[in-house]
Swiss-Prot record:
Protein's GO biological process: carbohydrate metabolic process; peptidoglycan biosynthetic process; UDP-N-acetylglucosamine biosynthetic process
Family statement drawn from the similarity comment of this UniProt entry: Belongs to the phosphohexose mutase family.
The organism of origin for this protein: Maridesulfovibrio salexigens (strain ATCC 14822 / DSM 2638 / NCIMB 8403 / VKM B-1763)
Taxonomic lineage from the root: Bacteria, Pseudomonadati, Thermodesulfobacteriota, Desulfovibrionia, Desulfovibrionales
One family name in Pfam for this protein: PGM_PMM_IV
Binding site for Mg(2+): S102, D243, D245, D247
Name listed for the protein in its UniProt record: Phosphoglucosamine mutase
GO cellular component, one term: cytosol
Reaction it catalyzes: alpha-D-glucosamine 1-phosphate = D-glucosamine 6-phosphate
Keyword Isomerase: yes
Length: 449
């Protein structure tokens, strides 16, 4: 039952269509309050959101449910997802909640949770909360009237987050002489660009005028080519593209070339290994990361540990293995020394530190990783049947794997947040990548639509 609610990154869907309705959000607040309330002390919840118009709806509904269960709610307004994770730890809160659909368009929204340590909730806890939300038999254990919660607005949350971010950058280093273009996707980080200016950089801003409807609209991490054009026009040193909730980063070099999460991870891993600071010489990434990244780590005396897709699974593996660097090709980058989740602005500062230390163009520094040709194609599906239960899909998959003969990879997976099957093919020969991706997508369209 609960799997109808939570995907790989919390609850997500189209606004005013189940499950993204005010009614579900109210019950979500009641359920979360019921689950996390314990003892006689006052309980704190941090709620942040991105810039979607519908954020007001879900912020109010969640707040009502939580306060009804005796939780005090601290609303921080538009705020990056990683900022809510940080503030949950910093303010000693019991729970952090983010209202965002990340890189999705404005008509979607979502809800995700952080525990008191700033980590995303385990699947089992999400499932318990979801079962309370969905069950018609749930009996709410309301507190007495004098013990209901209050709602507060925190005005200095942005300042706290910026101080924390700047702490991750060397105190004796500045960004004097660096010119960058920052694309905030008209999202949660729209007002935070001055942080780079405080460190000395010249900043050209785009995607920093949200109106509630333009989040991720032809801007941000899904449209790096637009950023690349602007970087070249401005003669900037690099471009930084965030998504709607600023938990991911895509970078553009001074020539306008796009660098994805794999390239950024390779640069950061190389820097940490060079300084003897990469624990176990291990990098954690997902099954989507390019084979070239895995080979790069091996060639440099390290290793790559792969996880299922989702930065939460990367973080879980990092905690288990004692790794300090991990991420996703999509731009979620986790620096465990400073953060418990993906943080686009934090990752940007770590990359800028390398750029300043090396004093070389980004296009040269990124040349350490030559990616194998890779293609990802989405196929819309009516329902997510297990691939192993569809003989035609299994036959096509086996045939492609045999033809690649170990010189490439094929990955079929369902999106955790959309009704989409994803086909990923990777090989040394780009023509084979195109051919096999098209063939497999055709089989999925025929048998899963």
């Amino acid at each position: 039952m609960s799997k109808r609610l939570f995907g790989t990154d919390g609850l997500r869907g189209q606004v005013n269509i189940f499950p993204m309705t005010a009614e579900v959000a109210l019950r979500m607040g009641l359920a979360a309050g019921s689950y996390f309330r314990n003892g006689k002390q006052r309980h704190k919840v941090i709620i942040g959101k991105d810039t979607r118009l519908s954020g007001y709806v879900f912020e109010s509904a969640l707040t009502s449910g939580l306060c009804a269960m005796g939780m005090d709610v601290f609303q921080v307004g538009p705020m990056p997802t990683p900022a809510v994770s940080f503030l949950t730890r910093n303010m000693r809160a019991d729970l952090g909640i983010v209202i965002s659909a990340s890189h999705n368009p404005f008509m979607d929204n979502g809800i995700k949770f952080f525990d008191s340590s700033g980590h995303k909730l385990p699947d089992a806890v999400e499932d318990e909360i979801a079962d309370m939300v969905l069950s018609q038999d749930t009996q709410w254990d309301y507190p007495q009237a004098e013990k209901v919660g209050r709602a507060y607005k925190i005005e200095d949350a942005r300042g706290r987050y910026i101080v924390y971010l700047k702490y991750s950058f060397p105190q004796d280093m500045t960004l004097n002489g660096v010119k960058l273009v920052l694309d905030c996707a008209n999202g949660a980080a729209y007002s935070l660009g001055h942080m780079f200016e405080e460190l000395g950089a010249e900043v050209v801003r785009i995607g920093d005028k949200p109106n509630g409807l333009n989040i991720n609209d032809k801007c941000g991490s899904l449209y790096p080519d637009i950023l690349g054009q602007r970087v070249v026009e401005e003669h900037a040193d690099l471009g930084l593209a965030l998504d709607g909730d600023a938990d991911r980063l895509i970078v553009v070099d001074e020539k306008g070339q796009v660098l994805d999460g794999d390239v950024i991870m390779a640069m950061c891993a190389a820097d940490l290994m060079e300084r003897g600071k990469l624990n176990h010489n291990m990098l954690v990434a997902t099954v989507m990361s390019n084979m070239a990244l895995e080979n790069f780590m091996k060639e440099n005396g390290g290793s790559l540990l792969r996880t299922p897709v989702g930065d939460r699974y990367v973080v879980e593996a990092m905690r288990r293995e004692g790794a300090i660097l991990g991420g996703e090709q999509s731009g979620h980058l986790i620096f465990k020394e400073f953060s418990t989740t993906g943080d686009g602005l934090l990752a940007a500062l770590q990359l800028l530190r390398i750029l300043c230390v090396k004093n070389r163009p980004l296009s040269e520094l990124s040349g350490l990783l030559e990616l194998y040709p890779q293609k990802l194609q989405n196929v819309h599906v009516k329902r997510k049947r297990p691939f192993e239960e569809v003989p035609a899909v299994q036959d096509a998959l086996k045939q492609v794997e045999q033809e690649l003969a170990g010189k490439g990879r094929v990955l079929l997976r369902y999106s955790g947040t959309e009704s989409v099957a994803r086909v990923m093919v990777e090989a040394e020969d780009s023509s084979k990548v195109e051919l096999y991706t098209s063939e497999l997508a055709g089989v999925l369209e025929e048998h899963l639509r």
